[in-house]
């Protein structure tokens, strides 16, 4: 083998990279175990322990625990539990605001039509709106709609339609970006570990948010869907507010003393000045938490009795500026509780508002210290004197000294009020507040007129950009609404982990046994070693991407292992052929690798094509599956083709392993001299296939498919009861209360206690409280089946499984459902087209392309038909969802592998035997690849059966579709793709009678 040195170096470097990234997971597991041991079951103490170490360098002196947790392999929501939502910023609402809410009939009608068409069209709302408006108002320029005060610097009466459309796209993108920034900040403040938030670039206005470990979904819904509230406030100085804080601390001391037993209150303590005592409080708390200084812990407890507030709040000693105090982030909740007490509020001025800064104190970010600002309310109604809706634009730039700054422009009304506000606060600070947190508090040097301002300070370029984003958020024209939602309880996630690990281990063991039994111990173990390396490299690469490992990702990994065996099977089968031809082991193995390479390359590349399409058109779990599948295929190509070759070359260069036969007693003569007349009955095969296709289409037309809410829109609730229930009993209860809404109930698992309830009840309605109202309504409806003492709070608690509760839920809005349906159709069609084009390019004969695509289309129709025939009476769900579409595409990718291998052999035989008739040539090609076809199919079926039996309910339907795909894909290679390709080519050269094969 050439380039051995490169392969070795690459393998070593890849191994080091994978070890490096996987090591972070071991570090975090170590500290998580220490936290659990320290906490002894107290979740809050465990989290406080980890938080106290978050910014400590715990790995090689370079990486903090927080950074290590960001680098580890995280678990997806279906394994860890949590919440996945897709939010949508209404593009039509944004366009209305940009047009100043015009009442023009053509404008409103065009916008309404565009919004409706967008659910099924591949074009976005802006394109559809422009097209419809031109139909309704021919010749009317778009500038007459959008030459508004808000867009005065971007659109004029002379602007062309193309220029206006460009501005609309920029403004809509800015609105979505603003929403993204607001959501990101809210989530960061919420304290979720390893959140994932991303704009869905292929869908205008949509943002996906994944929040692992969430236990309060209703709180999250309100957090995510609330409108951004940007405000400008006047401020106090620290020296003005410190006396009030001292009075509050004194009041709290009395409150704490009254709550403390008398014998504890008698302890003698030396009273030090409150502010001085609080100076090192953050360090003391961290040390106490870790148990490093018991004396310090006792002293701290005494300080908190004497000065409850100042023990955790350090007053600004300079007395200058609006920052009155500092506190560690884990103490902010307790400080808020203290400051909200009526007794403490009575000590404060009526116009004082205390608000936290949004980010840690810039001079001490490691300690996670936050600043407390003193806001002054001067309006009678208690509102801010100026709000963000007056901001027209904001951008980050550099001032005349070359330092980062932020420029801001306001509308006419805002400019007038801004001039008044700045005039009254010369020499003081004005706080910029978003969602209740202070982002900046610049000092006013002089009155600002005209509405144009420049904010300067000690900004980094990133901070200037963030502040500009905040200011732009103030004019966000439409809040984001949840259009899709999935909630998984942690115990359900643990069950998925157990099922996934079990299916993975059993599949790996069976694959190893199978390879050894078919090809002998040493070749089998070499192939098995490649599988282990495949797993190691795949996990390492996933870790380097900071990707989350999901149940579908585990399935993709397991399936990639099954498909990885295909490369070893191809190599070993070709090697056996060369050995039977009389070659020595060295030469046979070298030729085996060489002759199998093109088939391995083409089959892997076609699978990657379907994986890429799957990734681009899928969302959530489908993307996770596609990612692991693509990585697994790429790695399997490297390990099977190059790494195993290094092993054999190393030993055979020393004249070792020269007695290998690459077979066992079981497989020695398996299909070695097969002479099946496949082509002689090609018309029978095609007629039979045609009849099956007609039957499948008839069932699809009459019985249809059981579509889940991914395609219809609606809500799913997976409910676990204390006792066994009948699905029909549950359905009747719900149907009697949910009116005309569609309701379906199916059993989940085998214990008879868990059901999945699907309904489209009130799915068209939007609002922050709709989901909680429906959960409450469901609780009232199912009360007769619940344990008597179950409350609503217990019922909706995803962690509770006693007496009956919701353990997971899912919501898919109508617009999302339509998009998923369109994307599913396009993904399958594009996969077929892409594969057909690739086969044409590689084999340079359209007969191969037509045969392949026709066979793949047959596979797809037969799988759909089987689901149509079987749903309703099989003991597991056969509903059509995004995962099923993923299975279809994966089956297509697997099926084309087989066809590529056969056609590659046909192409090879054309070169070796140019005078042999096509009839015999096709038969010989099918017979010589039959052993590979059987071995690959069996090895893949072993994996799929493990997933099907052991993988759990969530992945069983996927495995069933894949099993159908493997079975029918193998058959279609022999009885559809090959006969069609043969029939299309046979007219180019005469055929000989079928008896010629038997000579």
Model-found features: residue ranges?
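Interfacial helix-loop-helix hairpins and adjacent transmembrane helices
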Residues: 1-17, 21, 25-69, 73, ...
């Amino acid at each position: 083998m050439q380039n051995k040195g490169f392969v070795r170096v690459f393998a070593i470097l890849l191994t080091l990279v994978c070890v490096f990234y996987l090591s972070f997971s071991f570090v975090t597991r170590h500290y998580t175990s220490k936290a659990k041991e320290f906490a002894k079951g107290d979740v809050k103490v465990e989290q406080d322990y980890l938080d106290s170490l978050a910014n400590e360098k715990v790995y090689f002196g370079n990486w903090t625990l927080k950074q290590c947790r960001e680098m580890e392999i995280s678990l997806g929501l279906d394994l860890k539990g949590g919440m996945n939502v897709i939010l949508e910023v209404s593009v039509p609402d944004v366009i209305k605001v940009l047009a100043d809410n015009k009442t023009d009939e053509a404008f409103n009608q065009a916008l309404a039509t565009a919004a409706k068409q967008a659910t099924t069209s591949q074009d976005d709302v802006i394109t559809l709106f422009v097209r419809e408006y031109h139909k309704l108002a021919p010749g009317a320029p778009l500038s007459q709609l959008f030459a508004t005060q808000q867009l005065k610097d971007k659109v004029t009466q002379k602007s062309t339609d193309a220029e206006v459309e460009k501005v609309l796209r920029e403004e809509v993108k800015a609105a979505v970006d603003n929403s993204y920034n607001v959501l990101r900040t809210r989530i960061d403040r919420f304290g979720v570990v390893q959140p994932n938030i991303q704009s869905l670039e292929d869908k205008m206005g949509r943002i996906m948010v994944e929040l692992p470990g969430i236990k309060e979904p209703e709180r999250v819904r309100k957090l995510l869907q609330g409108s951004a509230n940007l405000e400008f406030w006047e401020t106090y100085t620290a020296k003005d507010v410190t006396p009030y804080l001292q009075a509050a601390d004194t009041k709290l001391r009395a409150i704490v003393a009254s709550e403390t037993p008398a014998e504890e209150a008698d302890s003698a303590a030396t009273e030090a000045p409150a502010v001085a005592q609080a100076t090192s409080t953050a360090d003391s708390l961290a040390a106490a938490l870790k148990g490093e200084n018991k004396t310090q812990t006792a002293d701290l407890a005494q300080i908190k009795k004497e000065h409850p507030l100042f023990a955790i709040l350090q007053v600004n000693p300079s007395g200058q500026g609006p920052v009155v105090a500092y506190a560690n982030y884990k103490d902010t909740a307790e400080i808020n509780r203290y400051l909200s007490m009526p007794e403490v509020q009575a000590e404060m001025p009526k116009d004082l508002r205390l608000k936290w800064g949004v980010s840690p104190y810039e001079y001490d970010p490691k300690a996670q210290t936050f600043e407390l600002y003193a806001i002054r309310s001067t309006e009678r109604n208690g509102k801010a004197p100026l709000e963000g809706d007056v901001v027209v634009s904001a951008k980050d730039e550099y001032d005349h000294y070359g330092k980062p700054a932020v420029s801001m422009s306001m509308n006419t009304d805002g400019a007038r009020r801004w001039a008044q506000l700045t005039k009254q606060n010369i020499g003081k600070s004005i706080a910029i507040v978003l969602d209740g947190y202070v982002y900046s508090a610049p000092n006013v040097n002089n009155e600002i007129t005209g509405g144009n301002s420049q904010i300067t300070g000690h900004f980094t370029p990133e901070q200037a950009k963030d502040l500009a984003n905040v200011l732009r958020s103030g004019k966000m024209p439409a809040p984001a609404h949840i259009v899709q939602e999935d909630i998984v309880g942690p115990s359900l996630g643990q069950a998925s982990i157990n099922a996934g690990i079990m299916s993975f281990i059993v599949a790996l063991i069976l694959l190893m046994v199978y390879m050894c039994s078919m090809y002998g111990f040493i070749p089998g173990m070499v192939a098995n070693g490649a599988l282990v390396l495949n797993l190691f490299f795949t996990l390492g690469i996933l870790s380097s991407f900071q990707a989350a490992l999901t149940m579908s990702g585990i399935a993709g990994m397991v399936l990639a292992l099954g498909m990885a065996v295909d490369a070893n099977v191809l190599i070993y089968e070709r090697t056996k052929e060369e050995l039977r031809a009389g070659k020595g082991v060295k030469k046979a193995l070298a030729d085996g690798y060489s002759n199998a390479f093109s088939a391995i390359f083409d089959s892997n590349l076609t699978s990657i094509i379907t994986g890429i399409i799957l990734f681009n058109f899928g969302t959530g779990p489908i993307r996770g599956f596609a990612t692991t599948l693509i990585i697994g295929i790429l790695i399997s190509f490297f390990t099977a083709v190059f790494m195993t070759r290094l092993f054999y070359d190393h030993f055979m260069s020393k004249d070792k392993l020269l007695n290998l036969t690459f077979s066992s007693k079981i497989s020695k003569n398996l299909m070695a001299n097969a002479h099946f007349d496949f082509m002689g009955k090609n018309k029978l095969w095609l007629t039979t296939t045609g009849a099956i296709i007609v039957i499948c289409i008839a069932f699809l037309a009459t019985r249809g498919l059981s579509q889940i809410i991914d395609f219809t829109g609606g809500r799913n609730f997976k409910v676990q009861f204390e006792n066994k229930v009948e699905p029909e009993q549950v359905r009747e209860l719900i149907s009697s209360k949910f009116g005309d809404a569609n309701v379906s109930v199916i059993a989940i698992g085998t214990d008879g206690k868990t059901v999945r309830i699907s309904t489209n009840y009130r799915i068209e309605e939007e609002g922050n409280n709709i989901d909680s109202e429906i959960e409450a309504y469901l609780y009232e409806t199912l009360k007769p089946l619940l344990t008597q003492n179950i409350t609503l709070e217990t019922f909706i608690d995803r962690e509770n499984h006693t007496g009956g509760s919701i353990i997971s839920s899912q919501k898919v809005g109508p617009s999302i459902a339509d998009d998923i349906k369109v994307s599913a159709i396009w993904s399958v069609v594009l996969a077929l087209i892409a594969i057909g084009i690739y086969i044409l390019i590689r084999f340079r004969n359209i007969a191969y392309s037509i045969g392949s695509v026709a066979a793949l289309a047959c596979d797809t129709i037969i799988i759909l038909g089987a689901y149509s025939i079987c749903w309703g009476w099989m003991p597991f769900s056969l509903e059509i969802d995004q995962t099923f579409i993923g299975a279809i595409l994966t089956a297509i990718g697997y099926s084309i592998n087989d066809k590529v291998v056969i056609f590659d052999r046909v192409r090879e035989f054309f070169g070796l035997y140019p005078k042999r008739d096509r009839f015999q040539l096709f038969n010989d090609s099918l017979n010589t690849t039959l052993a590979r076809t059987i071995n690959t199919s069996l090895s893949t079926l072993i994996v799929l059966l493990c997933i099907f039996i052991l993988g759990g309910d969530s992945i069983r339907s996927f495995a069933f579709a894949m099993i159908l795909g493997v079975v029918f894909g193998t058959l279609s290679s022999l009885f559809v793709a090959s006969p069609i390709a043969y029939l299309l080519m046979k007219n180019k050269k005469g055929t000989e009678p079928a008896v010629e094969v038997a000579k």
